[in-house]
Regions:
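Membrane-embedded transmembrane helical bundles of large multi-pass transporters/channels
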Residues: 1-34, 133-376, 477, 494-699
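Structured non-transmembrane domains adjacent to transmembrane bundles in polytopic membrane proteins
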Residues: 44-65, 69-162, 371-378, 382-544, ...
């Protein structure tokens, strides 16, 4: 109570401090760099990551793009290349014309090289940058190149992808927050008992969201996914805590004549309840931090921090605001639109065997769909973008006109004998889907003496430490075909140079697939175990964690199984994140009902009356909480043109509804079925089991 009384006493200073903290938070939020490159989150010790660093360090080359130039004369292409070379951070521009010095007749260059760079109406230009794929300066360079090239040119590559992604995110993100706020407000206006309190909630939660976004500055940078989802998720998840305080305060007002004393008791009650409840949510987010694909750590830390700040705001800023606006809040109260649920709850409990059958019947198809969905995810980030984006159009041109879907790069020892390199190139060219392997050795020896090659070309393909070879592939990034191709190329490479490295977007994506497959198992296990232990401690029971997690896991299986049955493919990160977010965020519904059920049983009610009362009293809170999460995420899912954001928000929205329905219909049935087991395995309830037994013996 000391803390609660202090909050009430210092309510005005608390509001002033919160408002003052918004200023540095705003600056911190604006200064936090946003990372749009998924490949940056791969473990740093992987060959693909090490190879990218070597390429940048030894050749001064980081990002790489192909430009498709249509209907342009060779002399104009040459002029265009000269203009592109002047762009800041463009390291090298490689085209058909640049492969030979002007004094060397083009006729003596291999036909394969000509075909690689030219079709009937198009020319291919390769651009190397001296900065990393997702560096701000690289994205600026991409924009400059596009402005120079005009409508006849199409810029592809990962840097073009992250540039388009950044531009689209910056355009959409403010609208995400606006949609979430408007729809969450509508949900609260409908389901709460005051026309004014939703706006007080939003003020308190909004301050905590800004503090969370501002403190991200100390992380250095966050991913665009984290930035897009953080505000929406924090609003949806921490809304529950505000609702709990408001309900508690209204109850205490009827017990105490002084509203300040009522608030002090409400804060104490809320703190006890909300800390236990928030632990499951925090555990779900912290589980993401155990991913070796460090995007999970990024999202996990930011969201766990947001939940903690949400709890702090709920017991400090929110009570201060409620007391400040108490009179208008009380005047704006109205009767709740949610009817009395006693009769409905009695009906659900009466037919509980039906819901046991439903539970058993749903497990197999839900689990099958869930496993299939996990197998059908996509990893190509280009699929996240709308079809009219410049990157997507450029990739289509590259595929249609040059039959080119992905580009790999090889780094081999500079001292590797030319004959071995030629032999390796020959073997690699024989691999299915490889169009051509370009290196010094594929030019030299085809009628072109090495000394005839311009220095600009030899510098691109060889340094003191490494030889660089470029492999063009017909196979799409992240496809099974390209992954098998990469395995074959790596086998050939290691035969000639055990320290050689195969790098590029497709090899990185293959590493990402293998990394996230492992992460999925780890994160799921950690989140389930952590939440199991928290429920076991909170409920002082061994059996209840199994029952509660079974209910929410079924909801997760249904939610993530539906995309398979609907013929939808999800971005790879969605199932990993959603399974933990849904478990952590919605298991609170089950804990709320179970806690009331225990209290009723300990008060002497039989199992039917206990479950009915628990269900009837919990439904309003579960509906408000579930609809709040649904409202905050559904609008964003419908609006967003970025599939990874849209998919994750749709899964969260649907997950809230599915979890809500499972808790309302299936959890009561399981509590009825397992009542004896619960009593025997829950601290302080064993005597109820004996009591039931003695009653049955008397009968």
């Amino acid at each position: 109570m000391h803390f609660s009384k202090a909050v009430v006493k210092f309510r005005i200073p608390i509001i002033i401090i919160a408002l003052v903290l918004l200023v540095p938070s705003l600056f911190g939020m604006m200064a936090t760099r946003i990372n749009y490159d998924m490949l940056d989150y791969l473990p740093g010790d992987m060959d693909t990551v090490v190879g990218q660093e070597e390429l940048l360090e030894d050749f001064g080359k980081g990002a790489f793009s192909f430009i498709v130039v249509e209907d342009m004369e060779p002399k104009d292409v040459k002029t265009l290349c000269s203009e592109i070379e002047k762009v800041d951070h463009v390291e090298t521009v490689l085209s058909w014309a640049s492969l030979a010095d002007v004094s060397v007749p083009m006729e003596i260059l291999p036909d394969e090289i000509y075909r690689e760079f030219n079709t009937e109406n198009s020319t291919l230009v390769a651009v190397f940058f001296d900065s990393a794929t997702s560096a701000d300066v690289t994205m600026d360079a991409i924009r400059s190149i596009r402005s120079i090239c005009g409508k006849q040119c199409f810029v592809s590559g990962m840097s073009a992808l992250v540039t388009d992604l950044k531009d689209l995110c910056e355009k959409e993100e403010p609208i995400y927050v606006a949609i979430a706020v408007v729809l969450a407000t509508v949900a609260m206006l409908i389901f709460l008992d005051s026309w004014l309190v939703p706006f007080v909630f939003l003020a308190s939660i909004g301050m905590m969201i800004l503090l969370n976004l501002g403190t991200n500055y100390f992380m250095g940078e966050i991913s665009y996914i984290t930035k897009a989802l953080a505000s929406v998720l924090q609003l949806a998840v921490t809304m529950d805590y505000s609702i709990f305080l408001w309900h508690s305060y209204n109850e205490k007002r009827s017990e105490y004549s002084d509203n300040k004393e009522a608030m002090a008791h409400a804060i104490s009650e809320t703190l006890t309840s909300v800390v236990g409840s928030s632990l499951t949510t925090v555990a779900g987010f912290i589980a993401l931090c155990f991913m070796s694909f460090t995007l999970g750590r990024d999202l996990g830390i930011v969201m766990a921090k947001g939940v903690v700040l949400g709890v702090i705001g709920c017991v400090t800023v929110l009570p201060s605001l409620i007391l400040l606006f108490d009179k208008p809040l009380q005047k704006a109260k109205h009767k709740s639109l949610i009817p009395d649920m006693t009769k409905f709850a009695g009906g659900v409990v009466k037919v509980f065997p039906v819901f046991i059958v439903v539970f058993v019947a749903l497990v197999a198809p839900a689990l099958y769909g869930y496993n299939q969905t996990n197998d059908e995810v996509y990893y190509d980030m280009g699929e996240c973008l709308p079809e009219d984006m410049e990157y997507v159009i450029a990739n289509s041109k590259l595929s249609e006109e040059f039959d080119l879907a992905s580009t790999h790069m090889l780094l081999v020892d500079a001292n590797l004998a030319p004959k071995d390199v030629k032999s390796m190139i020959k073997e690699m060219n024989a691999v299915d889907g490889v169009k051509y392997t370009l290196g010094l050795e594929s030019i030299v020896g085809s009628g072109v003496p090495e000394e005839f090659l311009p220095e600009s070309v030899t510098e691109i393909l060889q340094s003191d430490k490494w030889k660089l070879l470029v492999i063009n592939s017909e196979y799409k990034v992240a496809s099974d075909a390209v992954n098998e191709q990469i395995d074959q190329l790596n086998t050939i490479l290691k035969k000639y140079d055990s320290k050689g490295m195969l790098i590029g977007e497709a090899p990185c994506m293959k590493d990402m697939i293998e990394t996230t497959d492992h992460d999925f198992q780890v994160v799921n296990a950690i989140s389930i175990v952590a939440i199991f232990l928290i429920i076991a401690v909170v409920e002082k029971s061994i059996s209840l964690p199994f029952i509660l997690i079974a209910v929410i896991e079924l909801a997760i299986f249904i939610n993530l199984g539906l995309p398979h049955y609907l013929g939808q493919s999800l971005p790879f990160i969605a199932p990993i994140c959603i399974s933990t977010i849904q478990l952590g965020a919605t298991v609170d519904y089950a804990i709320l009902m179970t806690t009331r059920y225990k209290a009723e049983r300990l008060a002497g009610s039989d199992k039917r009356a206990s479950v009915s009362t628990a269900l009837a009293t919990s439904i309003p809170s579960i509906i408000v909480s579930g609809m709040g999460l649904f409202a905050a995420t559904f609008g964003v899912a419908v609006y967003s043109d970025i599939d990874i954001i849209s998919s994750m928000c749709m899964l969260m929205a649907r997950g809230a509804i599915v979890s809500m329905l499972c808790v309302i219909f299936i959890l009561p049935a399981l509590l009825m079925l397992c009542d004896k087991l619960v009593c025997r395995t829950t601290l302080g309830m064993a005597h109820l089991s004996k009591k039931n037994k003695s009653k049955s013996e008397v009968k």
